């Protein structure tokens, strides 16, 4: 007859702390392993290098062709003519916020083609 996992858990739960320590030591010796926790140093470094997933497209300067920039902003944002004009004239300002990297790069190319200066943050 074999012992089930539940029976093992119940047996360990009924042991004192000293008995559990002795059990762990015996298991380490029997199986040639260590119950020590693995250091989490490299994982913390990986979190610090977390890649940004949302970007803001900032219009920093209008450039010489204001009308083309307004048209590009209207096409990208679905704003009306007055709202797009106000947005462009308020530069430096955010054209779109929390967009993907691909969308931000595409919008930057469109606005720069229209003559605007653009940053992605």
From Swiss-Prot:
This protein's GO CC annotations: cytosolic large ribosomal subunit
Gene3D superfamilies referenced in this protein's UniProt entry, alphabetically: 3.30.1390.10, Single helix bin
Residues of the signal peptide: none
Key words, A-Z: Ribonucleoprotein, Ribosomal protein
One GO term of the biological process aspect: translation
Coiled-coil regions listed: none
Pfam families: Ribosomal_L12, Ribosomal_L12_N
GO molecular function: mRNA binding; structural constituent of ribosome
Record's subunit section: Homodimer. Part of the ribosomal stalk of the 50S ribosomal subunit. Forms a multimeric L10(L12)X complex, where L10 forms an elongated spine to which 2 to 4 L12 dimers bind in a sequential fashion. Binds GTP-bound translation factors.
Record NCBIfam families: L12 (TIGR00855)
Family: Belongs to the bacterial ribosomal protein bL12 family.
Protein task: Forms part of the ribosomal stalk which helps the ribosome interact with GTP-bound translation factors. Is thus essential for accurate translation.
Name the UniProt record assigns to this protein: Large ribosomal subunit protein bL12
Origin organism lineage: Bacteria, Pseudomonadati, Pseudomonadota, Gammaproteobacteria, Aeromonadales
């Amino acid at each position: 007859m074999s012992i089930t996992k539940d029976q093992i858990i119940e047996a360990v739960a009924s042991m004192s702390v000293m008995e559990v320590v002795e059990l762990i030591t015996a298991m380490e010796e029997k199986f040639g392993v260590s119950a020590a926790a693995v250091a989490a140093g490299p994982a913390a470094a990986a979190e610090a290098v977390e890649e940004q997933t949302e970007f803001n497209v900032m219009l920093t300067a209008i450039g010489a062709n204001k009308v083309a920039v307004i048209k590009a902003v209207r096409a990208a944002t679905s704003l009306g003519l007055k709202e797009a004009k106000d947005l462009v004239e308020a530069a430096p300002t955010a054209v779109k916020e929390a967009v993907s990297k691909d969308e931000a790069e595409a919008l930057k190319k469109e606005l720069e083609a229209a003559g605007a200066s653009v940053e992605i943050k």
